Amino acid sequence: SEMCIRDRPYNDGKDVSENDYVDVRLDHTLARPNIPFMDVQLYDWTPREASVYGPYSPKKRLVSLNSTYYSPIWPYMNALNFYVIRYADLLLWRAEAAIETGDLETGRKYINMIRERAKNTQHVKTMDQSQDAANYKVGVYDEPFKSKNEAVQALRMERRLEMAHEGIRFFDLVRWGVADEVINAYIAKEKV
């Protein structure tokens, strides 16, 4: 079956191995060690002080160094427009409203619209372009959600994947009433 929240426990806290399936949006959103960074080179996290900042770097809204839109002189700006609201955000708001009012089927429909687009997104390739850089797998929810809780968990994971690095997660956590729980758990783990 295609990978959905049903295939792996939601936010189980376990690291993904190089043989596990991952959502293709992961490698379009952040740079991971040994995965091509844009189309320039393999990402090398060693200059980043991983013990402080972690081994990952954001990729969203960056332009490839090989792009004609990239300015190779200071201040290294590009002409990408800044968006305030994306269409995907609207679809996920609609899904959330439907789920919160008990219409789980409409919520599933809108979540699946996002997942279908992600499923058909171009995969990040190895540097020689011969194969996918990771084991990518994204599926849709073929069967109705079994409960409101399952629908809520699917929606929250979808927002986390789709809207990553866009500066809105905190507001999602506040709206859902879980900001203190999630942030305190994160701080407790990170301070060790």
Q: Model segments located where?
A:
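Short, small-residue-biased leader/transition segments that mark boundaries at the very start
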Residues: M3-I5
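Acidic/polar-rich alpha-helix caps and helix-coil junctions
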Residues: R8, G13-V192
